[in-house]
A protein has these predicted regions:
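Ferredoxin-type iron-sulfur electron-transfer modules and their immediate structural context
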Residues: 1-60
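Iron-sulfur-cluster electron-transfer modules
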Residues: 2, 39-214, 220, 226
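Cys/His-enriched microdomains
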Residues: 9-12, 16, 20, 61-71, ...
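Cys/His-coordinated zinc-binding microdomains
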Residues: 15, 26, 67, 74-77, ...
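Cysteine-centered loop/knuckle micro-motif
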Residues: 21-22, 72-73, 344
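Cofactor-cradling patches in redox/metallo enzymes
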Residues: 76, 141-236, 268-364
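C-terminal amphipathic alpha-helical segment
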Residues: 237-285
Length: 364
């Protein structure tokens, strides 16, 4: 990936050759949300004499981090990474997005609530990860920040793994993590200092574990790629739930195969990490698996990433609408990420996530 200075120069001079693949631009139709304009906005914001306003800084928040523009770029520039880290420039200039005000405090509170929710449940409190075991990290969706928190997903994780363990005694010992969050929101907001501190604390808490298993696609990418980029390498190996389960797929105690489904491939798993394990697992538990079109590098982002649902909820919904309309789904949609599934459902397009179906298919 070219460095920031080179990337900004090349992008500002580019005749918008990647605009046609940017899902944010496609859904909005706004010239100010082409990758070229967003990178030019960041270039202007970084000038020593710059006196930017919140309105002028807004374009750099119009990115979900999906990476579609990079696949179309001859220079393999990473506008997503530069724009996300460039949001720190906006924060330092006091022109950060108002929707992200007090984000570190809110994330810390949410992580605490998620941890407490697990510890309050006697069943889950007795299943915490011990040194040497596989650590299970439930997602930290906003809908789970109060009340039950991540309890429902944590119970689903344990249910699937417990059922598998009855047939594969060689499955490693596992337990729940109570860290609450991997800190994706801090990274996506461009709060580098807060994110680095949070990441270092997270890394310390999981240092005694050999493996981390995540359900969220963005957190998987964050832990595998972004942590090391920020100088915080993790000791444990990071696996998405589907990666962890795939070697044991033939032993999954499938009681009944589920009807045909349409698979939604999350950007951070498919385009970023080239992980197709969720689809392969669905093939084990479903009669037929179709794909939400287009597929591969041409797939459309649903709008769940980059904090776009917080900074521009209307645009995030438009992206979900386009992804589903273009996808031509003829059966229920299943996402490889609970965050994507939640966003699609909230946008009026019911979608389930992989874990839901794993529980259903293995229920006697």
């Amino acid at each position: 990936m070219p460095d920031l200075s080179t990337s900004l120069t090349l992008c500002s001079l580019c005749p918008k050759l990647c605009s046609h693949v940017c899902p944010v631009y496609r859904a909005s139709g706004r010239e100010t949300l082409t990758p070229q304009f967003k990178m030019s906005s960041l270039l202007n914001l970084r000038r020593p004499e710059a006196t930017a306003t919140e309105v002028e800084a807004l374009p750099i928040y119009g990115c979900t981090g999906c990476g579609a523009c990079t696949t179309a770029c001859l220079h393999k520039i990473e506008p997503a990474q530069h724009l996300i880290r460039g949001r720190m420039t906006a924060e330092r200039a006091d022109v950060g997005h108002p929707a992200l005000y007090d984000l570190p405090e809110r994330l810390f509170h949410r992580a605490q609530e998620a941890s407490r929710a697990i510890l309050r449940d006697p069943e889950l409190a007795s299943r915490l990860a011990q040194p040497g075991e596989v650590g299970l990290l439930p997602s930290c969706l906003p809908r789970r920040q109060l009340g039950e928190g991540p309890v429902a997903e944590a119970k689903q994780l344990l249910t699937v793994l417990d059922r598998l363990r009855e047939h594969r005694r060689d499955l490693p010992e596992y337990g729940l993590l109570t860290v609450g969050s991997a800190g994706y929101a801090l990274y996506a907001a461009g709060l580098d200092e807060s994110f680095r501190l949070y990441a270092e604390s997270f890394a310390h808490k999981v240092a005694s574990l050999p493996t981390l298993v995540t359900t969220c696609s963005a957190c998987t990418y964050l832990l595998k790629v972004v942590y090391p980029q920020h100088g915080v390498p993790l000791g444990p190996k990071v696996l998405h739930l589907s990666e962890f389960l795939l070697p044991y797929a033939s032993a999954l105690p499938v009681v009944r195969r589920l009807p045909k489904v349409t698979y939604h491939a999350p950007c951070h798993l498919s385009r970023r990490l080239h992980i197709d394990a969720p689809r392969q697992l669905l093939g084990r538990i479903c009669e037929q698996v179709d794909d939400l079109l287009p597929v591969g590098d041409e797939s459309l982002c649903c709008g769940a990433g980059g904090l776009l649902p917080q900074t521009d909820p209307q645009l995030a919904q438009q992206m979900a609408d386009e992804a589903i309309a273009t996808g031509a789904a003829t059966s229920p949609v299943v996402s490889g990420c609970p965050s994507c599934g939640y966003h699609l459902t909230k946008s009026g397009h019911p979608a389930r996530d992989l874990l839901d179906l794993l529980v259903e298919a293995t229920t006697p």
